A protein has these predicted regions:
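Terminal "cap-and-tail" regions of soluble proteins that handle hydrophobic small molecules
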Residues: 2-8, 104-177, 181-184, 266-324
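Short beta-edge strand/loop motif at the mouth of beta-sheet-based domains
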Residues: 14-15, 21, 25, 33-72, ...
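Short, flexible helix/strand-to-coil boundary loops that buttress conserved ligand/catalytic motifs
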Residues: 30, 40, 86, 139, ...
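Short beta-strand segments that buttress and anchor functional surface loops
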Residues: 57-63, 83-89, 111-113, 219-224, ...
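Short glycine/serine/proline-enriched coil/turn segments at secondary-structure junctions
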Residues: 65, 90-92, 119, 210-211, ...
Length: 324
């Protein structure tokens, strides 16, 4: 079985699994492009028969999607160490290290994923766990059954609240609830200012905002990157704990409802966003948009603006189509 450990301070995800095979056999499976493509279920972008070396391309496309990771081999020390970048095409890139050690029962593989600032550790950990079981199957072993969603949620509980950045979708009757939980290292009063004032909103939402700070007040946004506007109604205004408003003209043709909830946390503020959507709405689009924008709230609380990054937003769309 795979053991997974997450370090919030170092932003590393480490997975360890033992294989009852000689180190050379396991190395061939993790360091040969054709073998990698087979057990990872990806399309290798390049010559599958090529021999990897330091500086070589390490590019592949995830099957049944157009999501690509463009990368390079950073260290190559057979049969013990392979280190490569990951998603250089979507800054900031990550780094993945494969370390193989000989043990009495065969080979111990330790995979360390050095996460960029905005990566989701539970989702990434569950994905790697499944892939390490697929590696076992490719070596002729019986893989352990893994439920990806259940494992992701288990890792979320184990890794702690700062590790989770993805939204979660649940359904209630003819509605669907998109929920994000974020831990922000700022007091609730500072986060409230970021969420509810034109100056604060402009830093993380890339929008010009007009807000009447009262229940029933007008809430207007003009999204600068898209030259598009929306006008809703403030439904809840309870500083510094709850701020809600309607989101009009969804694809389903009816209003949806957004609620921000803030509560003190030992690290600062626990921010929860709940977007109550009609069943017909495209939750994937909202998930990608909220995810990207919430990533900018921390900088906004420090007075910094976040420029629009369409490339990352499109990658998040692809991720949520696979995982939401």
């Amino acid at each position: 079985m795979t053991e997974a450990v997450y370090s919030a301070s170092e932003r590393t995800l480490t997975l360890t699994r033992d294989y009852p095979h000689p180190i050379d056999r396991v190395w061939a499976a993790v360091a040969t492009p054709a073998r990698i493509a087979d057990w990872m279920g990806v399309q290798w972008l390049g010559d599958e028969g090529a021999v990897l070396h330091q500086g070589a391309h390490f590019d592949y496309r995830f099957s049944n999607t157009d999501l690509e990771s463009r990368a390079h081999v950073l260290r190559f020390e057979p049969p013990h160490l392979l280190e490569h970048s990951w998603f250089e095409n979507v800054p900031p890139p990550a780094t993945v290290r494969w370390l193989l050690e000989e043990i009495t029962s065969g080979t111990r593989l330790t995979l360390t994923h050095f996460l960029p600032m905005f990566e989701e550790a539970p989702r990434t950990g569950a994905g790697w766990t499944i892939l390490l079981e697929q590696l076992a199957k490719s070596l002729g072993d019986q893989p352990a059954p893994v439920d990806w969603r259940a494992l992701r949620d288990d890792y979320a509980n184990r890794f702690g609240p700062e590790a989770t950045r993805d939204g979660r979708l649940s359904r209630a009757g003819d509605r669907q609830l998109l929920t994000f939980d974020r831990i922000l290292r700022h007091p609730p009063e500072k986060v409230w200012e970021v969420l509810t004032t034109p100056e604060g909103i402009g830093r993380w939402w890339q929008s010009d905002a007009e807000i009447e700070p009262r229940q029933g007040g007008r809430f207007h946004l003009r999204f600068r990157p898209f030259d598009h506007s929306m006008t809703g109604v403030v439904t809840i205004y309870d500083p510094p704990e709850r701020f809600g408003f309607t989101w009009p003209d969804t694809a389903a043709g009816t209003d949806s409802h957004v609620l921000f909830q803030l509560r003190p946390d030992p690290l600062g503020t626990h921010l929860r966003l709940v977007h109550d959507l009609p069943a017909e709405a495209d939750a994937t689009e909202f998930a990608a948009g909220w995810h990207w924008r919430l990533d900018g709230v921390d900088d906004a609380a420090r007075g910094l603006g976040t420029p629009w990054d369409e490339q990352r937003w499109r990658v998040l769309q692809k991720v949520y189509r696979m995982t939401l």
